[in-house]
Amino acid sequence: MKIDDVARVAGALKGVRCTAPHGLAQWRYHGRLVARQLDDAHVVIRADFDYRDSVLRQFPGTFSVPTRYIKHMMVVADLARGDDGAIEDALEAAWQLQRGAD
C-alpha cells in the first residue's frame, strides 16, 4: 500500500476531508483525526484501545505503537510491509469511531 491508496480509501469515507499542513497529509472527519501521514511509508490511525490491542495481536507486522502513542488512542500502520486489507479496515474503524462522537 502507498500513501495514495490511503488517500483513496480515506477520501471515500463520507465526511472525511484531507489537508496537508507541513506537506504531510491528514484525514479528518468534522475536524476529528482519522489518520495522519508520518512519512511515505507510515500513517498513524485513530483506534480505541480494544481495537488497537486486537490489530496488534492479529497483524504484528502491520501495526505498532511507538512509546509516544502508548497513552493515546492511535496505532501506526506500516504501509510498505503491512496487510492492505487490515489497514483499510483500520481506517474505516477510525472513521466509525469519530462518527460515533457526533
Locations of the language-model features?
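Charge-dense, helix-prone N-terminal extensions
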Residues: 1-102
